[in-house]
Amino acid sequence: MMYSENDSSIYIASVLGARLKRIRLNLDMTQAEVANKAWVSRRTVLNAEKGDAKLSDLIAILGALNMLN
């Protein structure tokens, strides 16, 4: 089966989302807490954890999770 560049982008986004969720849970934070700290909506955090987020939102969420060191 051939994979397109879009397929790999979708895969990378889903892996990144799963990692964001794992980090959040390891920090014992709720989606609402991350959203509040990142100045985004809880829905934005939820979507990011599903692999669907804008780069600016990902950066804000990573900052809220103290991952931009």
Model-inferred region functions:
Residues A18, D28-M29, A53-S56:
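Residue-level signal for the short linker/turn that defines the boundary of a DNA-recognition helix
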Residues L25:
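Short helix-to-coil "ATP-lid" hinge immediately C-terminal to the conserved N-box Asn in the Bergerat
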